[in-house]
Amino acid sequence: MINLIEIRRQLHQIPEIGLEEHKTQKYLLTIIHQIIQNKSFIQVETWQTGILVYLKGSQGQKTIGWRTDIDGLPVEELTNLPFASKNGRMHACGHDIHMTVALGLLEKLSESQPKNNLLFLFQPAEENEAGGKLMYDGGAFKNWLPDEFYGLHVRPDLKVGDIATNEQTLFAGTCEVELTFVGTGGHAAFPHTANDALVAAAYFVTQVQTIVSRNVDPLDSAVVTFGKMEAGTTNNIIAERAFLHGTIRSLTQEVNELTQKRLTELAKGVAQSFDMTIDLKLKQGGYLPVENNPKLAKELMDFFRNETKANLIDIAPAMTGEDFGYLLSKIPGVMFWLGINSEAPLHSQKMQADEEVLDFAVEAIGQFLDFKANRN
């Protein structure tokens, strides 16, 4: 039997950025091969730094998928844990917990051959490159494409034992925005001979707020945030260029596309009114809204509520993003939150998960996957 805490701590020490998860993949493969040895109904394939583990069912009428992400973040860890990472990277989003739970589930579900097929996906690059989309579009699944897909994300403000989801949208769709205004630099004393890109960028940031207040239906949700502006070099030089970096978030793809359209129109309009040029990049990629399948979500919620020790919470959507949304746009499925009881939030340098969640998650989720694989 594998040691979940030891595995989690080993993974926690080797976080890697998306599509660079070579040590992580090597370690995962070591544990996977330890679990599946002498089991002829299991096959393993790799795709770049991703891993697919396929359990062929004795009847195989459908394939149930379980997805976990494996990448870390470019964050310097400040937890002071004895097993803290020391390479300027950190599993500050809890993917070390995700991977460990997935390995525990693989061990549990591979004790005997299931009736239905099972696919365990260890997906790279959730944080930066939408690895789920890359794998789907790149044909990584081949003949193993699931009929239903399930996955989780840890949530610090929920307690161990809490599982939270809903029958609708769980996470927002996100779109990254990079916008550069290009004017003409000059001396601060002679503004009439220059064209101030900083002023244009500042004007744009205020104007773009009208998208949410005047273009989006008040009953819908959207966020347009610019968290970074770079312009100028010193106090007495008018900036030739101004760079803005922001994000769009919405609970439906329709609203996301509307927001992208209006942002583009406003950027072009401001540029024209200031007689400037712009360079605008909108990058949504695979970060679509995470839309749970209502029927499958109800089934999952009823199961956790009635058949396990989980405290099932029907939770409101969150404006966080997750690239599992792309896979759920292709394959019906469900994502849910898993409580880890951490005082520090996701992406924090001090985020710490309560390791008691490992045994709980493997037991409760294992019961559900066993139900899907053998009794459903």
Swiss-Prot record:
Any Gene Ontology biological process: lysine biosynthetic process via diaminopimelate
Entries under Gene3D superfamilies matching the protein: 3.30.70.360, Zn peptidases
Reactions accelerated catalytically: N-acetyl-(2S,6S)-2,6-diaminopimelate + H2O = (2S,6S)-2,6-diaminopimelate + acetate
EC numbers on record: 3.5.1.47
Pfam families named in the record: M20_dimer, Peptidase_M20
SUPFAM superfamilies on file: Bacterial exopeptidase dimerisation domain, Zn-dependent exopeptidases
Assigned keywords, A-Z: Amino-acid biosynthesis, Diaminopimelate biosynthesis, Hydrolase, Lysine biosynthesis
Family: Belongs to the peptidase M20A family. N-acetyldiaminopimelate deacetylase subfamily.
NCBIfam families: amidohydrolases (TIGR01891)
Protein name (Swiss-Prot/TrEMBL): N-acetyldiaminopimelate deacetylase
Biological classification of the source: Bacteria, Bacillati, Bacillota, Bacilli, Lactobacillales
